[in-house]
Amino acid sequence: MSLKEIAHRAGTSVSTVSRVLNQPDYKCKNPELEACIWAAAQEISYTPNTAAQTLKSGAPQIKTTPLTFDIFLTRFPSLSQDLFFSELFESLKKELLRQQCVPGKFLTLPEVTSMLKEKSSFSVTDTHADGIILLGKCPAELISTLQNHYHNIVGIDRNPTNFDYDEVICSGTTAAVTAMNYLISLGHKKIAYIGDCSYEARYIGYYQSLISHNLPLDYSNIYPTSQTREEGMKTMELILQREELPSAIFCANDSTALGVFDCLQRHRKKGYIPSVISIDNILESEQTKPMLTTIDIPKKEMAHHAVNLLLDRIHNQHSNAVRIELPCRLIVRESCSYCGR
């Protein structure tokens, strides 16, 4: 009945639904249809039929109650403000369902902060999940409360933490150094940075690269922002007002770079076309004009390892905090060129 209900909601066949949900290597030709199928599956709290799968494989049947994991977006009030976390969230939902788990509540920083102010509401939520997945850098003051409420925690981010819980990271510092080294190899010396500067690994990678190449750290080229598309556009407007313009711009994430492109398309100064590079490799980075050169952060793999760490801990396979670090990768497209100065 579950597959039929999902097929009805998504407007497709049961066989297509089954392939999307139960075959990890299946690639749906229609991305929008695939998104509808996963959304419908989450709406009805679908989990794969393990009994049917074990019967087919000949393995003994074991009745289990699906594990539920809440997901906490730690830095933004909405997924729309950072498309990296939006895509990571989609990968997580798929991975949870593939591992016969159920996505629980989706929490944001304003919601959790409000719960803490009400004191008792956080500890008496109507359902208690088996664990929680943190998306992004969690405020230090929330860690002890989360650890008291959730026995199993895993974090996913570009920055490592010193907190005592499992985490899957792709080093923001390494990603930033990779981006900066590429710009410098193209002859760029005046490189602006747009992004968070507060204990931020990508900012550390930015200035470390300048120092290692004996380039001056010009604070007038550093623009602290909250790393949204809107902030990227506003910051680029400020840059365009300068007399001396940077030849290249390093954005801490793709969302910021999209805002930079928005601004350049509206207010491009004659003859000024800066090289732009960023971090994340979101889907939209392939659709920009010019196509965005970026650093790939392996979102699907991060989601996969995060769920595995939670299940491993729940099954008492490890007790110490584990950190898995995945490599980043330079994706060269069209938005960077040799410096003409």
Predicted regions and their residues:
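Short amphipathic alpha-helical segment that frequently serves as the phosphate-/nucleotide-binding helix
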Residues: P31-E34, F85-E90
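Bacterial carbohydrate/catabolite-sensing allosteric modules
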Residues: Q42-E43, P48-T50, D70, T74-R75, ...
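A short, well-structured beta->alpha microelement
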Residues: G104-S121
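N-terminal helix-turn-helix DNA-binding module of bacterial transcription factors
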Residues: M1-G58
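Short, flexible/disordered intra-domain loops and linkers
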Residues: P77-F84, V112-M115
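Interdomain hinge and pocket-entrance segments immediately C-terminal to HTH DNA-binding domains
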Residues: P60-L79
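Short beta->alpha connector loops
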Residues: E111-S114, L134-A140, S255-T256
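A generic structural signal for short coil/turn motifs at secondary-structure boundaries
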Residues: P24-C28, S78-D82, Y165
